[in-house]
Amino acid sequence: MSVSALSSDRQIENLIVRYSHLGDEGNLAEFGALFDEADFVFGELTLRGGKAIEDLIGSTLVVHEDGTPRTRHITTNILIEVDETNGSAVARSSYNILQTAPDLLPLQVVGGGRYSDRFVRRNDAWHFARREVTIDFTGDTRFHLKGQQSA
């Protein structure tokens, strides 16, 4: 099925979920490319463009021997509001990050929060225009974020 055959809601939901899949796979280049023409807001930090986001994630995320962060981002409660006339949309969702690291960390939730997104339609396809990431809680991030490992 071509992208244009999918409803706007479905195309946008696919972008939201693709973000999780690419991050969990450790595919930082394609992860960053989701934001080639978009802002990525994390706390006080605002970055624009895929390479800047790829570099940020690469500098903060622990990548394990299998080439992944050994995580599963679970995105839920997705609420999408589309303005077809103006080719724009907004979405809100919640996320939880599960992680396990064999012999290091049992399966657990290492973080959770909210995404607030804006999308724009260009060339008959939907793209991120802005993603704001809010962290509401964290767990044991020693094997998820660089600089968190204890001695």
Predicted feature locations:
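Short, low-complexity N-terminal intrinsically disordered segments enriched in polar/charged residues
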Residues: 1-33
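Transmembrane beta-barrel outer-membrane domains
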Residues: 10, 71, 108-110
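Short beta-strand segments enriched in hydrophobic/aromatic residues
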Residues: 23, 35-36, 95-97, 132-135
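A solvent-exposed, acidic/Ser-Thr-rich amphipathic alpha-helical stretch
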Residues: 28-96
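Short beta-strand edge/turn micro-motifs at domain boundaries
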Residues: 88-90, 112-143
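Beta-strand elements of well-folded, non-transmembrane domains
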Residues: 95-99, 119-121
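Short, cysteine-centered beta-strand-loop-beta hairpins and adjacent loop/turn segments enriched
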Residues: 98-108, 138-139
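Extended, polar beta-sheet/loop recognition surfaces of beta-rich domains
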Residues: 141-151
